[in-house]
Amino acid sequence: MAEQPTFEQNLSQLETIVNQLEQGDVPLEQALDQFQKGVALSKQLQATLEGAEKTLTKMMNENGDEVPFEQADANE
């Protein structure tokens, strides 16, 4: 079983795809393939970020209650 790429690896791959597409010298079929890969990577990255955000919102305050991250940040 292959290891899952890290967030940083996926982000780097997405940046490479974006750079290739921005240069505009990629054949159409390859550009479409790269675009599809980029969309899939973007969705994976978004899911990872949402998971991290949910983890951070479970920060505990002094009373042991869970508080949303925005409230914890405002209390500092």
UniProtKB/Swiss-Prot annotation:
Biological processes, Gene Ontology terms: DNA catabolic process
Assigned EC number: 3.1.11.6
Localisation: Cytoplasm
Key words of the record: Cytoplasm, Exonuclease, Hydrolase, Nuclease
Pfam families, per database record: Exonuc_VII_S
Reactions catalysed, as given in the entry: Exonucleolytic cleavage in either 5'- to 3'- or 3'- to 5'-direction to yield nucleoside 5'-phosphates
Alphabetical list of InterPro entries matching this protein: Exonuc_VII_S, Exonuc_VII_ssu_sf
GO cellular component: cytosol; exodeoxyribonuclease VII complex
Disulfide bond sites: none
Gene Ontology molecular-function annotations: exodeoxyribonuclease VII activity
Stored PANTHER family: EXODEOXYRIBONUCLEASE 7 SMALL SUBUNIT (PTHR34137:SF1)
The protein's assembly and partners: Heterooligomer composed of large and small subunits.
Family to which this protein belongs: Belongs to the XseB family.
Function: Bidirectionally degrades single-stranded DNA into large acid-insoluble oligonucleotides, which are then degraded further into small acid-soluble oligonucleotides.
Protein name (Swiss-Prot/TrEMBL): Exodeoxyribonuclease 7 small subunit
Naturally occurring in which organism (per UniProt): Lactiplantibacillus plantarum (strain ATCC BAA-793 / NCIMB 8826 / WCFS1) (Lactobacillus plantarum)
Biological classification of the source: Bacteria, Bacillati, Bacillota, Bacilli, Lactobacillales
Gene: xseB
